[in-house]
Amino acid sequence: IISNIENYLTHNFTQEGEFIIHPLLVQKTYSETCWIPISDEELIQNKEWQTMIKKAEIKGLSEVMVHNTVCLYKTDDSNWCGKLYEETTFKKLLQDIKDNRYSLPTQREWEYLAGKGCRTIFPWGNNIDFSMNLKHMEWMDNDGEYTLEKENFFGLIIGDDPYCREIVYNEDEFSYKGGDGGRNICGGLGVVWGYFPVSPYFKDKELSIGDYINGGYDFFRRIIRIDDSVKEGYM
């Protein structure tokens, strides 16, 4: 087992190095992709959506979704909101970045934002703290706030859910950090293996990036470099 873990860490984790991380303004939480908000007026006027909401209310549901089409959900104040799925590509995301003059973290910048340069698998150590309240772990007491959804040392919500992978960009290539789309958990590998992908240093080397963004699993975090002429560098 130890040998398997060592091989896994060697193959799926970035290697230790020394880097200079320049000052950044960082979005506190990641943003979802592909989903476009529905206006209140449009939601009220659409008879099909109103029927879906009424059926959900009868069943006591707070959310109803048609895969890659529409999602209707109830907010904390019991109002219903909605969003439409709009297929998008990494090329479109890159254009949006250029048009709106923000950036995405590089791989090493994201690792620092999530781990603060820690030399352990997770920011808190090399193993799962079983007192944590973790998402997708049915055997845990999931009442209340999830532990990893709290602000970290930089005030960021980051690396909190293995199903949610963040898009990073460096050297003209997109890649993922912070999750594997839930593959390890869905594969029945348990809490430790299932949560390896939230490690600051996890990198799925076998995963290839296609043309299209997966709105169910792909997220992004805007950053602004104080001096946009520099990124992280080697020491």
Please identify what each model-predicted range represents.
Residues I1-L104, G210-M235:
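Extended beta-strand/loop cores of jelly-roll/beta-sandwich
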Residues E41-L43, E48, I121, W139, ...:
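General N-terminal targeting signals
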Residues C71-G188:
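Functional-site microenvironments in short loops/helix caps that host divalent-cation chemistry
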Residues E42, A56, G117, D129-S131, ...:
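Residue-level detector of solvent-exposed, low-hydrophobicity positions
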Residues W49-K54, I128-S131, G190-G194, Y201:
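Glycine-rich loops and low-complexity Gly/Arg-rich segments
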Residues K150, F154, G159-M235:
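Surface-exposed recognition segments
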Residues K59-V66, M140-N142, P200-I209:
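Low-complexity, flexible helical/coil segments
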Residues S3-N7, R101, G144-E145, V198-D204:
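A short linear-motif detector with a strong N-terminal bias
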